[in-house]
């Protein structure tokens, strides 16, 4: 920072926008340009929606399940062994030993149900080491996972139906 230049906390705000030039079409902005100017790109309505929508979905998922007596759990993401049989895993060097990134919280959710917790959920990262050689395949994503005791599969279907309707209604009413 140049100390000879006076610093100010002032900002410029505008109540309106007016285009100074006329254009018949919007310019094409490449992904490389967008990534090179990431802070500007993140200010666009589209990119802000990319951040906002998953945040709302996770919030409403959590709220809905909490109202239906679910307990939120947080399961380990580094494990001493592969948790899913036959699937590829991410092997991580961990203080001189091997560890693996968790593929899902399934084992821990089942343990909670067996321990009479009845209803549990987790929002957290999931890692899949499947080599699909496609840009459309995610090896890491945020999972919205739930587990519950049921007497009939209609119990689960009814809960999930209500939850999805709730989430989509909130998205439509607040942001649609």
For the regions a language model picked out, list residue spans one by one.
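Class II aminoacyl-tRNA synthetase catalytic cores and aaRS-like
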Residues: 1-176
């Amino acid at each position: 920072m140049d100390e000879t230049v006076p610093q100010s906390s002032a900002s410029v705000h505008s109540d309106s926008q007016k285009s100074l030039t006329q254009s018949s079409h919007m310019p094409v902005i490449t992904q490389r340009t967008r990534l090179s100017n990431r802070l500007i790109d993140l200010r666009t309505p589209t990119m802000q929606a990319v951040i906002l929508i998953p945040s709302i979905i996770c919030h409403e998922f959590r709220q809905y399940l909490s109202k239906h007596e679910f307990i939120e759990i947080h399961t380990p993401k580094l494990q001493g062994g592969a948790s899913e049989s036959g699937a590829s895993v991410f092997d991580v060097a961990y203080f001189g030993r091997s560890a693996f990134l968790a593929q899902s919280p399934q084992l821990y959710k089942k343990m909670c149900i067996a321990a009479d917790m009845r209803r549990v959920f987790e929002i957290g990262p999931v890692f899949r080491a499947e080599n699909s050689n496609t840009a459309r395949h995610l090896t890491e994503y945020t999972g919205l996972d739930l587990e519950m005791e049921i007497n009939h599969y209609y119990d689960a279907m009814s809960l999930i139906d209500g939850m999805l309707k709730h989430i989509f209604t909130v998205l439509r009413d607040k942001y649609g």
